Regions:
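Acidic, His/Gly-rich catalytic cores of divalent-metal-dependent hydrolytic chemistry
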Residues: 126-135, 150, 154-180
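Short secondary-structure boundary/capping segments
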Residues: 14-15, 65, 87, 133
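Histidine-centered divalent metal-coordination motifs
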Residues: 1-6, 81, 146
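A conserved mid-domain beta-alpha-beta active-site/ligand-binding segment of alpha/beta enzyme cores
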Residues: 59, 68-71
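Active-site HxH/HxHxD metal-binding segment of metal-dependent hydrolases
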Residues: 2-64, 161-162, 166-179
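Metallo-beta-lactamase
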Residues: 72-77, 83-155
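Short, conserved clusters of charged catalytic residues that mark active-site
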Residues: 5-8, 70, 124
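Well-ordered beta-strand scaffold positions
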Residues: 28, 64, 71, 93-94
Length: 180
């Protein structure tokens, strides 16, 4: 998604490490990059600065499967954190969740409440993601954008109906790398 902690290396004013990289982004998420939509955080009280990207873009849709050098990537829309937030299922084995799930020591929660565009939608999307994976009998490794990874399906969705609150201190998973 377009939050600068995830796309900062391709922003037009970045040092240039990825100036030639092709950016794969969901159609809805791209509206933030074009300026059509502004990102709001802290319970919609603040707008984040506009992220400007000049790279070539490939726009993605929910359920679309792409192949990059023999690697199968399935794009799954999970709106809530942002309106166009997607997760990416790689070869049916690895699920890159970005800011969809926050792992605490006792399991996964819907990502930080204060940073969501729509908290109810975020919770609903997380439950729908679980159902989509269950329907296909998939048990991927979950790789989050901030709180590590797990291969424990039940742990990943343990608190899918609850939001991670920035005002309630929760011990992070002591076994996970932690960068938040």
């Amino acid at each position: 998604h377009q939050d600068t902690d995830h796309v900062g290396a391709v922003e037009s004013d970045s040092p240039g490490l990825f100036k030639e990289a092709v950016l794969y982004v969901g159609e809805t998420e791209n509206r933030y990059l074009t300026g059509e939509t502004r990102r709001k955080v802290i319970y919609h009280m603040y707008k984040l600065p506009q992220v400007t990207i000049n790279n070539e873009k490939v726009l993605l849709t929910d359920g679309q499967v792409i192949d990059i050098d023999g690697i199968k990537i399935e794009c799954l829309l999970v709106p809530g954190h942002t309106w166009g937030h997607m997760v990416y299922l790689i070869d049916d084995k690895y699920l890159f969740t970005g800011d969809t799930i926050w792992f605490g020591a006792d399991g996964g929660y819907s990502f930080i409440a204060a940073l969501a565009e729509d908290n109810k939608l975020a919770v609903k999307s997380l439950a729908e993601l679980e159902a989509r994976l269950q329907k296909r009998n998939l048990r991927p490794m979950f790789i989050t954008g901030h709180t590590g990874w797990t291969d424990n399906f039940e742990f990943a969705f343990a608190h899918k109906d609850k939001l991670c609150s920035p005002f309630k201190k929760r011990v992070p998973d002591p076994t996970a790398p932690y960068d938040a």
